[in-house]
């Protein structure tokens, strides 16, 4: 069974058009979705995490259609935002406790798992590492990275949660190369 299945999933609203996304991802697999703009990458990440609903097509997380059953789909997903998670050590602990309550997890075990995950990632002050540790507190089936700055995050996540499917978005800006002597070309 696929963990994430996109079938011609498209998002279009107020001038933004992202898609179509058309792929399937199984447990333990990784996929990178490449876009020309950061905004498109963020929208695609949110589509894959059931935060944004597709305008057309379908996107399933497990058996759940993200348009019809977003709460059920979201319980299977860990989302790592491009901005990461800023704040003090205390703010991180409070966020872990809050999420543990929302997910119905034991708070002490969630705190321990978050600290262990953060230590395994290696940089306790990095906002993106903190967001990744927070996303991995519950045992999610799908982990979605919104534009990770470094490939080590995906590698660490795959080591920590090898059965978790991983989607990451990336931005590769294309450039038009114009020769220096372009203006000197004669007709």
Q: What residue spans do the PLM features occupy?
A:
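Walker A (P-loop) ATP-phosphate-binding motif of ABC ATPase nucleotide-binding domains
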Residues: 30-40
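ABC transporter nucleotide-binding domains
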Residues: 43, 72-78
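Helix-to-loop junction immediately C-terminal to a conserved catalytic motif
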Residues: 49
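Q-loop/switch helix immediately C-terminal to the Walker
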Residues: 76-79, 83, 88-106, 113-117
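Conserved beta-strand
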Residues: 6-9, 16-26, 31, 57
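Conserved catalytic loops of ABC-family nucleotide-binding domains
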Residues: 139-141, 150-176
